[in-house]
Amino acid sequence: MEKQLTIKGIKSQLAAISQENDPLLILYKDDRRVGVQKLLKQTYKKIQQHQLLVAQFQQRLALEKEAWSQGLNFVAGIDEVGRGCLAGPVITAAVILPHDFSVIEVNDSKQLSRHTRERLYPQIIEQALAVSIGVSSPSVIDQINILQATRQSMKK
């Protein structure tokens, strides 16, 4: 009689799976242990979340691909943070990434948790072809309004 792999062992195997048609998922599908079924459910969920991230990344990348196809080799992504004159300056960042950039979690900074932003930052900086940061002070915001201050910051 063949000895069953422990749930811990199965968990270790499933951690590396990235495709829904992986033979291990089929192998463990009929395992009646509650812990194994829970692991399978978690693995399928992880795979689906990853597939969604990839699809969203490809959708965001579509604009860059269009620009690249027209001969524009350097496309900057721009994001801003700041809450206006009461809370401080408005800060903008522009980043030019290489065509083969593949950190799929990169998104609007306001949609990412602080932990995720801090985890992605070194990867972005390491792979970026260029980075620029602009700041407009509260006094500038007071003088020309938040929208114009944001635009001015983006030009820096």
Q: What does each of the following model-derived ranges do?
A:
Residues M1-A76, E80, L86-I91, V95-K156:
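Acidic (Asp/Glu) carboxylate-rich active-site/surface patches
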